[in-house]
Amino acid sequence: MCDVDLKTCQKSSKFKKKDIVELGKQCGVNPYLSNGKEKSRTVICTEIVASYNPPPGSSQGDDSEHESISQVNNIPNRNEKFLPKSKYPTYTQVLNMEKRQLKALAKKLGLEYKKQTEQQLQGAINLKIKTLEGLNSSTRSRSPSVRSRCRSPSPRAPSVRSRLPSTRSRCRSPSPRAPSTRSRSPSVRSRCRSPSPRAPSVRSRSPSRQSVRQSSESADEAEQVALETMKTAHLRMLATTLGASTVTGMKKKDLIDYIKSRRKSPSPSPVPPSTRCDPTTTAPPMEDLFKKKVDELKTMAKNAGFVRWNGKTLSKMNKSDLVDFLLNGMNRPSPSLPQSRSRTRSPPPPPRSRSPSVGSPSVRDGGAGRRRLPELTRAQLTAMKVVDLKAMATELGLTRYRGMNRTQMRKGDVINFIIETQKKQKTPSPSPTPPSPVPSVVGSRRPKSPLPYKSRDFVALADDDSEPGVEVQKKMGKSGEREPKSVPNVRIIPSEIPAPTEGSLRSRLSTQQQTQQSVVYEDPNESIKPEESVRAPKLSVVDPQLSRKTLKPLPSLVVTDQPSKQPELPKYKGRTPYTDLEQLAQSKGYTVKQVSGDGNCLFRSVCKSIRALRGEKFTHRQLRQMVVDYLRENPEFLQVYLEYVARQRDNSLPSTEQYLSEMSKCGTWGDLICLKTLSEILKVQFNLLILNTKQFQMVSSQDDYPDVIPLGYIDNYHYTSLVPIGLDSKGGAASSTTTGLKQLDGPRPPITLIPESQVPAVAATISTQQPPSIVAPPISVGGSQLVPSIVPQPQMPKPDFKPVKPLSNLNELLDLMDRVKPQVYNDISQLEKARQSIKVSLGL
């Protein structure tokens, strides 16, 4: 029955699927897969025919290990996860395959082949084949049968066919006269070879020892392939978990060798018997463990008999610790790093406390009473959890750091504390010396970075000029937190700051204003700050060769989608911004009205300018609330600017409600959106005098608004109020210093339209019974010419205009209009009064 033809077995209608399965069982072929499902009809028939109908002249039979790759790829798709043992390609054949062949083979083996490189496919396929071969070898090793093969080269040596229920022998003779006899057994297959026809020798192999050796070799090769396919970052993490102190400079090959050495030579530290598992249990590959979730790893650890590992319970184990336990803690003791070699006796170890699992057991520091932990890089500390970092910082003696306690510190603050503490432990402590007084900055010492215009850190300089040095004091709030930032950090080069002169604006400042501390950005670089005033530091000669390049100020306005976050500020290269702006404004015909830099400078400056030019009174809180209310009622007005900011910065669209909630807070910086909104609400145009470009820039929602409000703008961080020269805070007209107009010493003379000598006599009829009436004199008309009876002769002086250079751009024209507009408005009002007087005198 088993000598059936392949074509007959596959296509004969008398054989159904269940008949083929029964036939396979009778012929010694396993018709089931490893997962319990039945093999396909074609595969069962192929195994039956290949086992019992070998082709004539074949010397290797069905166990040939040199099958072509095309035969491997031609396996039917109905049974993709099954490959006969003899169809596995070798390691060299897999390396020589093309990528499409590797994908087809990976698909048949049930592996992931999409978006995989050629090297990843080769490693995964070799690992899968080694695993399948190890399973097949372990299955065969558990069988108590002996497989031997007998061959009789002599044509006269007859081979006897015997049917035994438990043994299976196969003899082949190349002679056509020697009938082949087969012994059939569903579980045992033996082959014997006899070099002589009369003395057949049976060579038996011990499958148990061979299978154990083969499984161990396949496990080592599978581990090597898995380590080669892993990323370098994962290898470094695994090496750190296994006890490596420094993995920064190690290459991938060195990492693999270290991991394999740790796997082969575990630490001899004792392990509780409850954590030991069955020695026959093999740990899963490292790559598969890292792909699993933490919950799955915890379940595997529970099944493996987990109690404690490296002093941690299961709830405190992270992913790397779980992988370390599953790789090393199931069959062997817990690995630990070797302690630092020292000739002196180490004190007894302190009681175990919650500490990170990275690094070796800590050693107590000399007389400091703290435990010295191994030095870790910033990358290793970043990979740790915040709880472990805080535990390590507590062991290093953390009480307070930069005004923050342990609960207020974030992950970055804890990492900075650990790194600074490690540096202090690394450097030897110097001998105690008496404290020296803090000297002042003298000589030719150059500061390492440009001076900040205003800074959170102010400097108290001593009077001793022996040695250069500074003493920095932190300005903290009542609760220990840093105060909010309101004024940006504008750096000033000290070599360009002149000493204050008598009569200047700087010398007129009060002592309280000069010594007032300001709250701004904290400069991370080391710098030298002014002594008494943020505007006039007293510094001596500096070295120009040590000057640093500074950033240019931004000439344009800043639009921000997060008002609470101050923009990055440029470095100011001028002398003092307020003095320079005052000089620039005076050259343009304006007076600077300073406002406080508390974050409300935009709204305060608009209040002052509106009050001076139009007489309307507002507070900065009212203007801020008006802006927020208008944007809430008109969200489309705000959405356009937020979309523009999102496109320019290539980030997600900010929330309108988030912007409004931040802008409604007092002290939040105003931006271009607020200026546009105020222009729409107040129906005015804002003319910004920018200190950096020394030019005016018009900002308005519409160009047809008649009123223009000038403002001063200092390098993207501060607004001031500008008032035309001659106007006080109440909006009244005063003496004018407009360029191009002659200034009058006294008050403007009254306009006289009709001289007193030529005033005509007007006869009025006035009685008590009738209302008074004004009768104009008759006008004599002679010929075609009309002679007026009243000849006005005004006595206004002619204005003396100086020669004006031709205008070059629109900004100069707007500047000229701003200077002439107050004078013209005054003249127009006087002309209107004269017109009314003429009408009254003529009786109209």
From Swiss-Prot:
Which parts of the chain are coiled coil?
A: none
Q: Where is the composition biased (Pro residues)?
A: 429-438
Descriptive protein name: Putative ubiquitin thioesterase 232R
In terms of PANTHER family, this protein maps to: OTU DOMAIN CONTAINING PROTEIN (PTHR12419), OTU DOMAIN-CONTAINING PROTEIN DDB_G0284757 (PTHR12419:SF11)
Bias (Basic and acidic residues): 472-485, 526-535
Q: Where are the compositionally biased (Low complexity) regions?
A: 137-216, 332-341, 354-364, 504-518
* Reaction it catalyzes: Thiol-dependent hydrolysis of ester, thioester, amide, peptide and isopeptide bonds formed by the C-terminal Gly of ubiquitin (a 76-residue protein attached to proteins as an intracellular targeting signal)
- Active site (UniProt): D598, C601 (nucleophile), H718
Query: SMART domains recorded for this chain?
Result: Rho_N
A GO molecular function annotation here is:
cysteine-type deubiquitinase activity
**What does the protein in this record do?**
Hydrolase that can remove conjugated ubiquitin from proteins and may therefore play an important regulatory role at the level of protein turnover by preventing degradation.
* One biological process term in Gene Ontology: DNA-templated transcription termination
Could you say which EC number(s) this protein's record lists? 3.4.19.12
Q: Which UniProt keywords apply?
A: Hydrolase, Protease, Thiol protease, Ubl conjugation pathway
Segments crossing the lipid bilayer: none
Could you tell me which residues belong to the region Disordered?
Answer: 136-223, 261-287, 326-377, 422-541
